[in-house]
């Protein structure tokens, strides 16, 4: 099965998405938490063997440096370049945020002009609409990466060898649909709670994405960092 996850426009776009969930000024966000979420997302992509641009890995290495310096015991006064690295990162995120807002405003103005003159919309507008549509799926993916980060320790101590074909996406789709028939709604946490193997969790997640793609299952997240809820769609 060919799985394609809608990507962010770059590492700064991913960081901006994570920072914006806190709904505070960019310089007030808990930077270590944001870094951990970014690294969990990257690790999940690698585990699922999805393509990852080099710029994401470069940013990951820079973030790990900032995180390690933040967590080291403060035996000496903070080095000047330590503060500079963090402030430079936050400055880049803030600058990117302004750039993205301006781009969206320009796209909106272009859309309005296109309607007035009855001209076909350019590809940029359609591409932007697709990005907006996929945001809920990306939130699901980010939530999954956080759950996987929490379960890594358990998976590490389970050495049972599982063949790839032992877990089939089609079977997991049927399992999810059967549970939704009984329970009406299901959180992503509950869905993955009893997974003992990494392949099992990944296959369940991919099955969820396929059900969402086919519009058989809907998802809802009522608040930032809240539970992801899966519900059966009414046909």
Swiss-Prot record:
Primary location: cytoplasm
A Pfam family that the UniProt record links to this protein: SMC_ScpA
Alphabetically ordered keywords of this record: Cell cycle, Cell division, Chromosome partition, Cytoplasm
Localization terms from the record: Cytoplasm
Cellular component GO terms held in the UniProt record: cytoplasm
Domain of life: Bacteria
GO biological process: cell division; chromosome segregation; DNA replication
Listed InterPro entries: ScpA, ScpA-like_C
Keyword GTP-binding tagged: no
Family: Belongs to the ScpA family.
Subunit structure: Component of a cohesin-like complex composed of ScpA, ScpB and the Smc homodimer, in which ScpA and ScpB bind to the head domain of Smc. The presence of the three proteins is required for the association of the complex with DNA.
Function description: Participates in chromosomal partition during cell division. May act via the formation of a condensin-like complex containing Smc and ScpB that pull DNA away from mid-cell into both cell halves.
Record-given protein name: Segregation and condensation protein A
Species annotation: Streptococcus equi subsp. zooepidemicus (strain H70)
